[in-house]
């Protein structure tokens, strides 16, 4: 199965293949996609460096600068490590094909596949809608304004016809920028969903051990059959652990960047929302905050699900028919239970586990700094 044909990851992989971020890079796609977006981000930093006085303008420019810097880093990391991503996706496609043949796990696989595809497609539509808000907002404010504040040395970007040209270019670049940012979040979410499928498959295999024990006498199976099945469960458990480790290595450092940057931007946007008195600006700030929270929540919620379900592996064994097994098999089951007490975790910068508790702490810190800013401002 080709990676773009794998249903659970196919939506995001096709977007990346279209822009040549996977497999063989094509310079023509880079010249109309990620390279102009990276140049735009440089001009955004120049604008941010030269912005003084207007607090709302500074915060909005800072938000877009950080957002575009984040998506440029995401794409750069993807392109530089594309072989690593391709190998990971090939493993997902191969395992998906095997699980699809398993009648017991197929309903779970199909349910999570539908959920993953719906999440990927809805994220793209949400990104398109928010991006449309980005580029149309300047049309509803007095005076000339660009979707993204930029400074081009030696050029007055608000003078005719430069203003019109830059505006149209920014509208165009919003599309490839959206394709650089959204699929990475969806890739992470769908891959964690696939980890949940594998954990469910392991629990089913462990549950079948009890049925083996109960039918050994009637079918003439020896303890060797049960032992061989247990060895396969051990190997599969180790495979899932390696899968989560590989996924963590692909996202952990970018999650740290988002944790630091968007935590600060959330605080700044809340502050700007509290002092804004224009309805259009308040609506736009609300959409910015919603985008930050939705993307961050997608990361932390799915990572938390993997952690909780991996802890349930030990419960699946303990609730089985392990007292009926022979002592050598019981000892190996204890090893699996002991390993399951160390949950499979995806970490922020390989330091802190990504859990809903961690997400709540991020919100608490952002809100605390917001109240401090508000008090100082008043």
Swiss-Prot record:
Its main location: membrane. GO terms for molecular function: odorant binding; olfactory receptor activity. It is a multi-pass membrane protein. Pfam families: 7tm_6. The chain crosses the membrane at residues 2-22, 30-50, 60-80, 121-141, 165-185, 255-275, 279-299. It comes from the Eukaryota. Expressed in male and female antennae and maxillary palps. One of its GO terms (biological process) is signal transduction. Glycans are attached at residue 364. Signal peptide: none annotated. Keywords: Cell membrane, Glycoprotein, Membrane, Olfaction, Receptor, Sensory transduction, Transducer, Transmembrane, Transmembrane helix. InterPro entries: 7tm6_olfct_rcpt (IPR004117). Induction: Strong response to the odorant 2-methylphenol when expressed in odorant receptor deficient Drosophila. It is found in: Cell membrane. Residues 1, 51-59, 142-164, 276-278 are cytoplasmic. Residues 23-29, 81-120, 186-254, 300-378 are extracellular. One of its GO terms (cellular component) is plasma membrane. Belongs to the insect chemoreceptor superfamily. Heteromeric odorant receptor channel (TC 1.A.69) family. Or30a subfamily. PANTHER family: ODORANT RECEPTOR (PTHR21137), ODORANT RECEPTOR 30A-RELATED (PTHR21137:SF3). Odorant receptor which plays a critical role in the anthropophilic host-seeking behavior; establishes the host preference to transmit malaria. This is Odorant receptor Or2. It comes from Anopheles gambiae.
